[in-house]
Design a protein with these regions (language model features):
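Conserved short "hinge" loops at termini or chain/domain junctions
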Residues: 1-75
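Domain-terminus/edge residues, biased toward the C-terminal soluble/receptor-binding domains
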Residues: 46-58, 73, 77-103
């Protein structure tokens, strides 16, 4: 929506547990078309809660891969598109969908 204000994205990164990828707030804002009216003080906690929820849901998956010697989602597959493998992309998609639904 045009409102005369230039879009400024939050360049912060939310660090994750080590297995799943970190989340860049700007990537969420761009991919999910988050309106300017939703400020950073609302976005960050919602993303953190979404990350925590998805991490809980994927505990068994993470444990399975760790037992196979895989230390991070980046190592799950060697097939990369635009710098990410399918596990990283799907993780971010799940987090972003949850966060946007809560906003």
């Amino acid at each position: 929506m045009f409102n005369g204000r230039a879009r400024e994205y939050n360049t912060d990164t939310i660090s994750n547990s080590g297995f799943w990828p970190h989340i860049e707030i700007a990537e969420f804002q761009k991919q999910r078309a988050i309106p300017l009216q939703i400020n950073d003080q609302m976005i960050r906690p919602v993303l953190i809660a979404a990350m925590q929820g998805v991490n809980i849901d994927l505990q068994a998956v993470e444990q399975h891969y760790k037992e196979m010697g895989i230390k991070s989602a980046a190592q799950i597959s060697n097939d990369y598109i635009d710098g990410e493998n399918y596990a990283e992309t799907l993780y971010k998609k799940a987090v972003f969908a949850r966060a946007k639904a809560e906003l």
